[in-house]
Amino acid sequence: MNIQALMQQAQTMQKKVEANVENAKKDLANKEVHAEAGSGLVKVTMTGRHVVKRLTIDPSLLEDEPDMIEDLIAAAINDAVRQADELYETTMAGATSGMGLPPGMQGMF
């Protein structure tokens, strides 16, 4: 195999990876994760791209101390971020699978 053919093969692979990654990013924007804190008193819905779509606070919490509400909101959002990160890793691994990329390179996207 000559160098020109090798370069063309690398270019083709790069375009395919870029297209797959772009499709995966669009897919992540449409997927949602759901998290909660305080046994469901605070609920968060977030996209796979870390956009908070909904935040629900049980009315009973509004009578309590603001510190408790703030802690539960932070916990729910942090859980949603963790789930969105896992969704991202899984989706990107799928987008670049079968491409023969070296280990660790999938996480670069």
Curated annotation (Swiss-Prot):
Q: Answer yes or no on keyword Disulfide bond.
A: no
Q: Tell me where in or outside the cell this protein is found.
A: Cytoplasm, Nucleoid
Give the UniProt keywords, A-Z. Cytoplasm, DNA-binding
Q: Which GO terms describe its molecular function?
A: DNA binding
**UniProt entry tagged with the keyword 4Fe-4S:** no
Specify where it is mainly localized. cytoplasm
Q: Under the cellular component aspect of Gene Ontology, which terms does the record hold?
A: bacterial nucleoid; cytosol
Q: Which PANTHER family match?
A: NUCLEOID-ASSOCIATED PROTEIN YBAB (PTHR33449:SF1)
Described by its record, this protein's role is as follows: Binds to DNA and alters its conformation. May be involved in regulation of gene expression, nucleoid organization and DNA protection.
Instruction: Relate the assembly described in the record.
Output: Homodimer.
**Family designation:** Belongs to the YbaB/EbfC family.
- What's the protein here called? Nucleoid-associated protein Psyc_0793
